[in-house]
Amino acid sequence: MSDFDEAVAENYREAGEILTTVMAETRELIEPGVTHLEVAEYAEERVHELGDGLAFPVNISVDAEASHATPERDDETTFDDEMVCLDIGVHVDGYIADAATTVDLSGTPELVEAAEEALAAAIDAAGPGVPE
């Protein structure tokens, strides 16, 4: 690997490590009664403490809401009994790591199990030479 390639790889590694840390910490804050804004601000502050910056504003979507909802500065919406999607992006020198996770506050484990089974089936079906 050339020096440039190694520098790029290191930026991606660092962004991924920061993202992993912030995602794990932030998902623990998601519980009924906590505001979406509190969670988003925590994640954004941690990204800035640990690295270069955010790739995009923290996104928090609930239930059937499409992804990429970002709380506004005056948002007082609190979490309730719902499915929550947390999406965070980190960049280091412009190289981005992006991940999302779902937190189930709904008490509907069947939905989570069905999603996990569908993901496992898709992974099993994917691979080199598999037709589209």
What do the predicted segments below correspond to?
Residues 1-132:
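Active-site neighborhoods and metal-handling regions in enzymes and metal-associated proteins
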